[in-house]
Amino acid sequence: MSVPPPPKEDLIKPNPPKSESAVSGFNWWRRTFQYKTGLGLTPEEETQYENDYKFVLQRKQCSKCYEYRDWLLNYSPTVIFMTQQIAKLNNKNTNADVFKFDESKIICDVCPDWKSGGFHPDLGILICQNRIKDKWHLEDTLAHELVHYFDNLKWEVDWLNLRHHACSEIRASSLSGECRFFQEFARRGFNTGFKVDRGHQACVKRRAAISVSGNPNCRDKEHAERVVDEVWDSCFNDTRPFDEIYR
């Protein structure tokens, strides 16, 4: 089944409001009441309210995203461990006590796609603030992208090479926790093909193939699945920098 595109309104970034007072306090309450009831609202004011509402919503999403990011960088065992390993790769000749991950490499923004995050070898990690459900969803997403970050530093991944891309996607889906039992069951359940035995591996294969299918060098879904199968054994069993699948 094909996935429908995101709503078109998500692709549009709103303009800032005319003033901060227009989106706070009594003025914002009054405008919201007028919009919901239609009382005393001109077409121009209605359009302006819709723009301002999107602005307020995206600002809240952005603030919450960075709040979650900062909390996870300080308290999530998985995220802390991954950032430490990345810092070591970035600073091989530096004393381990001063390893520090640059959190500016993790930014929050609005995304037009359904995905919850992304990684770019030059820019770093993007968290899709409008797709994140809660702190724990962001933890899985951030852990996934940090595996890509680690792989890119350690092996100089060619992201247009389908085998390279597939290998990192397999590792990221397996090690991030996004395919742990309860997470996958919540997404799919028994009625949508979820199996208790080997469910983790099936989830990893499915999600890796979805990601690889978006590579410009991938022809179609079947091509992505075939490439994932080709590199499966070596990549799934490579749990570095963990000793084993942690989550």
Swiss-Prot record:
One of its GO terms (molecular function) is metalloendopeptidase activity. Pfam families: Peptidase_M76. Belongs to the peptidase M76 family. Has a dual role in the assembly of mitochondrial ATPase. Acts as a protease that removes N-terminal residues of mitochondrial ATPase CF(0) subunit 6 at the intermembrane space side. Also involved in the correct assembly of the membrane-embedded ATPase CF(0) particle, probably mediating association of subunit 6 with the subunit 9 ring. Its EC number is 3.4.24.-. GO terms for biological process: mitochondrial protein processing; mitochondrial proton-transporting ATP synthase complex assembly. A divalent metal cation binds at residues 144, 148. Residues 1-21 are annotated as: Disordered. Keywords: Hydrolase, Membrane, Metal-binding, Metalloprotease, Mitochondrion, Mitochondrion inner membrane, Protease. This is Mitochondrial inner membrane protease ATP23. It is found in: Mitochondrion inner membrane. The gene is ATP23. It comes from Kluyveromyces lactis (strain ATCC 8585 / CBS 2359 / DSM 70799 / NBRC 1267 / NRRL Y-1140 / WM37) (Yeast). It is a peripheral membrane protein. One of its GO terms (cellular component) is mitochondrial inner membrane. It comes from the Eukaryota. The active site is at 145. InterPro entries: Peptidase_M76_ATP23.
